């Protein structure tokens, strides 16, 4: 089998980055005293599931990067050949890991842009408030508390 070196290296680094993000989100959810289920195999449309005992949440894990004072992540999937696909109906929340600041955020899929989502780390220069998502509002610890009960 012939493998192009450049594509192979890119694919491996993408897989490793995704694995690191999944491990970080899993760790953060467990530290927040939540029960976390890990689906078996790669055929599942989500990466993790949180079970509170009262409801379940399908979690799609994303690795973010910081650009222009914002935590930025792709809020769509690519199904190689079919283009961009929304996660609506396939996941309930994004578990977003930012390796640059080593933090995890939980962002609802509903209401997220269908291509790229940005969470601001700092206030806007023009003091705009409408439509601005601040990263601090999506901390994993706050989301866990908002569920009403931790599954400890």
Report residues per predicted region:
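Acidic-basic catalytic patches of nuclease active cores, encompassing PD-(D/E)XK
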Residues: 2-37
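A structural signal for short, well-ordered beta-strand segments and their strand-loop junctions
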Residues: 38-39, 106
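Non-catalytic C-terminal interaction segments of nucleic acid-processing enzymes
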Residues: 101, 105-152
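Catalytic cores of nucleic-acid endonucleases
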Residues: 62-104, 109
């Amino acid at each position: 089998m012939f493998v192009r070196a450049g594509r192979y290296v890119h694919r491996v680094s993408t897989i490793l980055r995704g694995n690191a993000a999944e491990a970080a989100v899993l760790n953060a959810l467990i530290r927040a005293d939540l029960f976390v289920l890990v689906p078996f195999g790669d055929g599942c449309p989500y990466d993790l599931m949180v079970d509170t005992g009262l409801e379940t949440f399908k979690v799609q894990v994303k690795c973010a990067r910081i650009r222009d004072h914002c935590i930025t992540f792709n809020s769509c999937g690519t199904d190689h050949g079919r283009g961009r696909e929304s996660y609506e109906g396939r996941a309930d929340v994004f578990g977003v890991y930012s390796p640059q600041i080593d933090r995890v955020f939980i962002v609802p899929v509903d209401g997220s842009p269908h291509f790229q989502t940005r969470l601001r780390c700092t206030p806007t220069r023009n003091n705009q408030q409408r439509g601005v998502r601040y990263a601090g509002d999506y901390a994993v610890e706050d989301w866990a508390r908002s569920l009403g009960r931790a599954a400890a």
